[in-house]
Amino acid sequence: MKKRRSKKERQELLQQTIETNPFITDEDLAEKFQVSIQTVRLDRMELSIPELRERIKHVATKQHEEDVKSLPLEEVVGEIIDIELDRHAISIFEVKVEHVFKRNQIARGHHLFAQANSLAVAVIDEELALTAKSTIRYIRPVKLGERVVAKARVEDVENDKGRTVVKVRSFVGEELVFTGTFEMYRSSNYSEEGNNL
């Protein structure tokens, strides 16, 4: 039989978990620590840790509208909460009724792809970025009500080919649900005639 953690030990672990993953929900924390949601909320209050919505706002303190060059922010699928152009970016996508199949409540795959692809475009430090090629993998179905956190990282800038490689990994909680590798053309490599494509 597993020994129950002391309140102090649980609160220390809860604080570490939230610092590692600020997007974790109270429900996920309750499941992880095998306590009620009310206990998690009381622990957060005692530790002065804000609720999820406030933590997300805190992480998203940058003015991303000024940061993103390659497309209007409203065209990004999901909400960008962190971005450093030509390096990395993070977005959150809430799966709602309009994103799922009615009969099984599973998210339509094109929404996960669109979140990852638009994040790969947004992270490029150019006025125009186009997806030349992508390799994607759906690891498990995402369901109604789940929150998908996509993390994009610029892996390689191939100047001789005029491409930038962006890898995107999408998570629900700590579980990997989608991966994608996107080869991106940059505006400096794009011609009106499409000769460089």
Swiss-Prot record:
Pfam families membership: 4HBT
GO terms assigned for molecular function: DNA binding; DNA-binding transcription factor activity
Segments crossing the lipid bilayer: none
Gene3D superfamilies noted in UniProt: Hotdog Thioesterase, Winged helix-like DNA-binding domain superfamily/Winged helix DNA-binding domain
One of the GO biological process terms: negative regulation of DNA-templated transcription
Keyword Nucleotide-binding: no
The protein's name in its UniProt record: Transcription factor FapR
The family this protein is said to belong to: Belongs to the FapR family.
Keywords: DNA-binding, Fatty acid biosynthesis, Fatty acid metabolism, Lipid biosynthesis, Lipid metabolism, Repressor, Transcription, Transcription regulation
InterPro entries per UniProt: HotDog_dom_sf, Thioestr_dom, Transcription_factor_FapR, WH-like_DNA-bd_sf, WH_DNA-bd_sf
Originating gene: fapR
Top-level lineage group: Bacteria
SUPFAM superfamilies: Thioesterase/thiol ester dehydrase-isomerase, Winged helix' DNA-binding domain
Task performed by this protein: Transcriptional factor involved in regulation of membrane lipid biosynthesis by repressing genes involved in fatty acid and phospholipid metabolism.
